[in-house]
Amino acid sequence: MQTIHIGVLSASDRASKGIYEDLSGKAIQEVLSEYLLNPLEFYYEIVADERDLIEKSLIKMCDEYQCDLVVTTGGTGPALRDITPEATEKVCQKMLPGFGELMRMTSLKYVPTAILSRQSAGIRNKSLIINLPGKPKSIRECLEAVFPAIPYCVDLILGNYMQVNEKNIQAFRPKQ
């Protein structure tokens, strides 16, 4: 079984300064560990809400570490320093707006302010990048919604084959 390389990038001014513990990055690792049977290698970073820092980390995770999947958390709202979607779009060759649409639709079931989210997803080379919200509960809800499409997307961009733990989540792959 192939090892899946996963980048986890937390964008947070306060967590990057050690003001509080980053629970969101840990939540991403926990959920993906439940969903995948493959051996997983996580590359984890916390950076401030600075566009150039986010872009550099995304590029490093995609190009140097050759992550199959890069998941960001934080910086997707309308606040002045929330710039994760812009950094993601800058480094991607293709954007996948359906991921953000589904995550917003899912989150709207729980909170009306989900309409303020600017989550997105895109492809850089052979890496799928997905922007998630900043709260662990919302991370789980959004990953549960979009994960069924992730393994097939990674297949299409020639990433490593993801073995899904079907006891915890179902993925969709069209019959070949």
Curated annotation (Swiss-Prot):
It holds the Pfam family MoCF_biosynth. GO terms for molecular function: ATP binding; molybdopterin adenylyltransferase activity. One of its GO terms (cellular component) is cytosol. It is an enzyme of class 2 (transferase). It catalyses: molybdopterin + ATP + H(+) = adenylyl-molybdopterin + diphosphate. Its EC number is 2.7.7.75. Pathway: Cofactor biosynthesis; molybdopterin biosynthesis. GO terms for biological process: Mo-molybdopterin cofactor biosynthetic process; molybdopterin cofactor biosynthetic process. Keywords: ATP-binding, Molybdenum cofactor biosynthesis, Nucleotide-binding, Transferase. Gene3D superfamilies: MoaB/Mog-like domain. The keyword Membrane does not apply. InterPro entries: MoaB/Mog-like_dom_sf (IPR036425), MoaB/Mog_dom (IPR001453), MoCF_biosynth_CS (IPR008284), MPT_Adenylyltrnsfr/MoaC-Rel (IPR051920). The keyword rRNA-binding does not apply. Belongs to the MoaB/Mog family. PANTHER family: MOLYBDENUM COFACTOR BIOSYNTHESIS, MOLYBDOPTERIN MOLYBDOTRANSFERASE. Catalyzes the adenylation of molybdopterin as part of the biosynthesis of the molybdenum-cofactor. This is Molybdopterin adenylyltransferase. It comes from Helicobacter pylori (strain ATCC 700392 / 26695). The gene is mog.
